[in-house]
Amino acid sequence: MSFNTFGHLFRVTTFGESHGPAIGCVVDGCPPGLRFTVDEVQAALDRRRPGQSRFTTQRREPDQVRVISGTMDHPEGGLVTTGTPIGLLIENVDQRSKDYADIAGSYRPGHADVTYDLKYGLRDHRGGGRSSARETAMRVAAGAIAAKVLPGVTVRAALTRIGEIEIDRARWDWAQVSENPFFCPDPETVPVWTDYLDGIRKRGSSVGAVIEVVAEGVPAGLGAPIYGKLDADLAAAFMSINAVKGVEIGEGFNAARLTGEENADEMRTGNDGRPYFLSNHAGGILGGISSGEPVVARFAVKPTSSILTPRRTVDKFGTEEDLITKGRHDPCVGIRAVPVGEAMMLCVLADHLLRHRGQVGTTPVWPFQRG
């Protein structure tokens, strides 16, 4: 199976399976001389780690990361990148493959079981193998490295919708995101989601979600016309995350409801001589190139396909049957997708910054300034 690598200059290759001995990634193309600590990578992983609330899978994985290549000890503490491939490894410690023994020959509705089997002639029934969201832990680790390539850039994400219940954007407070198990920026929505998800969980069902990712401090000039568009790469990055079924940039699909006057981001010249935008319907990207405004994207995550409700399916011999998926699963997998979305934004921006430097050789700036 190929296509395990993402990026052009800042390249991330992941490996390992959900129920294998370990998962890992190789980050290639990271510039030398960047300082970081294992604790910084671990802190990012801890935000995604399973088993932290009753609303995520109860699989107990500590996700302790090891840096096995590409760095040296820095004299002042921590590590420094050498410019060679950075290897990151996490051992799996809480696999329960026996939970899947009864359905080894059955295709779980909504999962990649049938398509993997049709393409490769075999599949890993133990938690889905490579198709499991377990793989995304390594994306988060890679994102922590990518952040070091992007000084001055802040990437944050939040959950804005679970099922039919959406936050009140007028109450958006980034400080609240780390204060609840949902990464929710609206404190008044937290108890509503709590009751709602408790009901979903007790029924043995699941529900989808929407995540919004915002990157601030992104310089103008990242991205390229036509086939190297920043927003195209962001869309590909988010769509590569397990269970993601839709992506929008800026105003997204809502732009189809607006007039040209409403959607256009008008510009003025500030007192410093630099132009600025009066709005950001474009989500910080015009013509595939960053404008200097915050880059804003959203992606939709479908309900977890593994549920306790019996569903009709077939086995590999074509026999119809009722299937109940055992094991430990997220009632809303979108919750833990929040740090994954941040990581993919970071990896794309790091890649595009290095590509910009390689092609243009300068730091992106506004094209006109007053002396």
Curated annotation (Swiss-Prot):
Cysteine disulfide partners in this protein: none
UniProt keyword list: Amino-acid biosynthesis, Aromatic amino acid biosynthesis, FAD, Flavoprotein, FMN, Lyase, NADP
CC annotations in GO: cytosol
Top-level taxonomic group: Bacteria
Names of the cofactor(s): FMNH2
Entry's cofactor comment: Reduced FMN (FMNH(2)).
Residues binding FMN, per UniProt: 130-132, 242-243, 287, 302-306, 328
One record GO biological process: chorismate biosynthetic process
Listed PROSITE patterns: CHORISMATE_SYNTHASE_1, CHORISMATE_SYNTHASE_2, CHORISMATE_SYNTHASE_3
Biochemical pathway: Metabolic intermediate biosynthesis; chorismate biosynthesis; chorismate from D-erythrose 4-phosphate and phosphoenolpyruvate: step 7/7
Any matching Pfam family: Chorismate_synt
E.C. numbers: 4.2.3.5
Residue positions binding NADP(+): 48, 54
NCBIfam families per UniProt: aroC, PRK05382.1
Assembly and oligomerization: Homotetramer.
Described purpose of this protein according to its UniProt entry: This reaction introduces a second double bond into the aromatic ring system.
Protein family according to the UniProt entry: Belongs to the chorismate synthase family.
Protein name: Chorismate synthase
